[in-house]
């Protein structure tokens, strides 16, 4: 049984990154354990099912797997599922934690045959650690230095066959030598509203919360295509329904709760609207460089590129061009504004 959620709301309720270690623990309780329970990502699921089946039949380690895509789409969940489906242990770490070659060597030498090593944020591995990883991935061997100064010598250690599962939100930051060593590369895409509604319904059952199909769909529509956000919104809507209603999550109850949270009909919060309004009002619809945009809304460049932009671009409200960011006709419509002739947006997209 999952205990009552006692989390405080994060700064952005629609942020795709975990708000705290408590929320991470709560996510684990809702996480599907097997590939058959995993909703969405049909192409990736189909590929992994075949590759894992073949590896199990041959009693071999699965090829190394690279999972990339925006945060909150299930990369960590898939790593856990791979280990469970293969019937092996999972060892989990992240790129920034592996500061020295010895840190990685300690992990690798403790792996059992065919185990899964999951490295989150693998694009943040230091170059010296990455160099140690290359022979481990190709030949299941590592070279370590013993001693110091003139007495130092290199010792080659054999490793058990293993599977590296790397996850990243910034695939472009991976070095070519590292990327080329992954036999399986999969991009996770944003989820549809129907897929998210299925996830919300399943999570509600685990939380012993009452929800009707329209209530689940309303939450799903505003979850920005991201399961992590959908589950977070569900918990907040459940709180609202228990205090303001009879605990049953209907469409009207979900709408009222999400309005209180300042999440609008397409899943935008204050920061999304602030970014789009800056492009529209301060820069005439664009184009505007990302550094100028960051200064205008008081955010870091990385926050705009990694957190705010992906969903706005994917949904067609913002466009990246060689000259900068441009608001699309959909952005004008969302704010009830006329799309002025001769603006950056109308030149690129027209008034349709």
Swiss-Prot record:
Residues that bind DNA: 301, 320, 325
EC number(s) stated in the UniProt entry for this protein: 3.6.4.-
Segments of this protein annotated with the region Small ATPAse domain (RuvB-S): 192-262
Chain positions recorded as ATP binding sites: 30-31, 72, 75-77, 138-140, 181, 191, 228
Coiled-coil residue windows: none
Ranges where the record places region Large ATPase domain (RuvB-L): 4-191
Catalytic activity: ATP + H2O = ADP + phosphate + H(+)
GO MF annotation terms: ATP binding; ATP hydrolysis activity; four-way junction DNA binding; four-way junction helicase activity
Hydrolase recorded as keyword: yes
Top-rank taxon: Bacteria
Quaternary state and interactors: Homohexamer. Forms an RuvA(8)-RuvB(12)-Holliday junction (HJ) complex. HJ DNA is sandwiched between 2 RuvA tetramers; dsDNA enters through RuvA and exits via RuvB. An RuvB hexamer assembles on each DNA strand where it exits the tetramer. Each RuvB hexamer is contacted by two RuvA subunits (via domain III) on 2 adjacent RuvB subunits; this complex drives branch migration. In the full resolvosome a probable DNA-RuvA(4)-RuvB(12)-RuvC(2) complex forms which resolves the HJ.
Official protein name in the record: Holliday junction branch migration complex subunit RuvB
Taxonomic placement: Bacteria, Pseudomonadati, Pseudomonadota, Betaproteobacteria, Burkholderiales
């Amino acid at each position: 049984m999952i205990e009552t959620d006692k989390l405080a709301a994060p700064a952005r309720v629609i942020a795709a990154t975990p708000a705290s270690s408590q929320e991470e623990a709560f996510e684990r309780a809702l996480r599907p354990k097997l590939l058959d329970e995993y909703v969405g990502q049909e192409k990736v699921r189909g590929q992994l099912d075949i590759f894992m089946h073949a590896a199990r039949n041959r009693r071999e380690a699965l090829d190394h797997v690279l999972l990339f895509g925006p945060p909150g789409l299930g990369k960590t969940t898939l790593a856990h599922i791979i280990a469970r489906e293969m019937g092996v242990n999972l060892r989990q770490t992240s790129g920034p934690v592996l500061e020295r070659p010895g840190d990685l060597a300690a992990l690798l030498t403790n792996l059992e045959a065919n185990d899964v090593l999951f490295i989150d944020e693998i694009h943040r591995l230091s170059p010296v650690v990455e160099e140690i990883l290359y022979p481990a991935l190709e030949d299941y061997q590592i070279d370590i230095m013993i001693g110091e100064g003139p007495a130092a010598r290199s010792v080659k250690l054999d490793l058990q066959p293993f599977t590296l599962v790397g996850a990243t939100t910034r695939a472009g930051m991976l070095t070519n030598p590292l990327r080329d060593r992954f036999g399986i590369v999969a991009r996770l895409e944003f989820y549809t509203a129907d897929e998210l509604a299925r996830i919300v319904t399943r999570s509600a059952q685990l939380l012993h919360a009452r929800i009707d199909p329209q209530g689940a769909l309303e939450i799903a529509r505003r979850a920005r295509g991201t399961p992590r956000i959908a589950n977070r919104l569900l918990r907040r809507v459940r709180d609202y329904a228990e205090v303001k209603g009879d605990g049953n999550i209907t469409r009207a109850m979900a709408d009222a709760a999400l309005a209180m949270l300042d999440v609008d009909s397409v899943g935008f919060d204050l920061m999304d609207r602030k970014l789009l309004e800056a492009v529209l009002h301060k820069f005439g619809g664009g184009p505007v460089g990302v550094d100028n945009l960051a200064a205008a809304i008081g955010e870091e460049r990385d926050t705009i590129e990694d957190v705010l932009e992906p969903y706005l671009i994917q949904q067609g409200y913002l466009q990246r061009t060689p000259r900068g960011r441009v608001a699309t006709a959909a952005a004008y419509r969302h704010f009830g504004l006329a799309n002025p002739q001769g603006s950056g947006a109308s030149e690129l997209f027209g008034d349709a």
